[in-house]
């Protein structure tokens, strides 16, 4: 029996799941005092250190809107795009406290999803020219 695999759709059920996940992440990251470490240690204008495949930009936009609806997200790249070290992925404008409150969550989210996308791209390239194919399957529990 052949199983039909297809690309994950950015549909309403997926967006609702993401909203639930973001609520948990915001509560965990910003429950009491906010992100004092980032405020103290991360320099303004910090950039990524490695090239890779970007993933999670729509999710990051939703995360920012949840933390501070007054902040504006302007993507400078697209999901699936290969980006270079230090390349700008998005520009954010808005109240500084809202942006700083969202910063750690955005970096964690984009770093995690882009890391997965980068590794997946390496696997796809490794099997190019063979009959092998790479598929995403969830082997973890929700939450």
Question: Which residues are covered by each model-predicted region?
Answer:
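Acidic/glycine-rich phosphate/pyrophosphate-binding loops and surrounding catalytic core
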Residues: 2-143
């Amino acid at each position: 029996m052949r199983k039909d695999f297809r690309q994950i759709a950015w549909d309403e059920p997926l967006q609702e799941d993401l909203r639930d996940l973001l609520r948990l992440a915001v509560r965990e990251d910003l429950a009491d005092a906010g992100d004092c470490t980032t405020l103290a240690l991360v320099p303004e204008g910090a950039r990524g250190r490695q090239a890779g495949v970007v993933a999670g930009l729509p999710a990051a936009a939703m995360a920012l809107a949840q933390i501070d609806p007054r902040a504006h997200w302007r993507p400078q790249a697209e999901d699936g795009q290969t980006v270079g070290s230090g390349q700008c992925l998005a520009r954010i404008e808005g109240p500084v406290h809202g942006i700083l409150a969202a910063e750690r969550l955005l970096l964690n989210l984009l770093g995690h999803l882009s890391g997965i996308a980068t590794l997946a791209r390496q696997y796809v390239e490794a099997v190019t020219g063979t009959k092998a194919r790479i598929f995403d399957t969830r082997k973890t529990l929700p939450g």
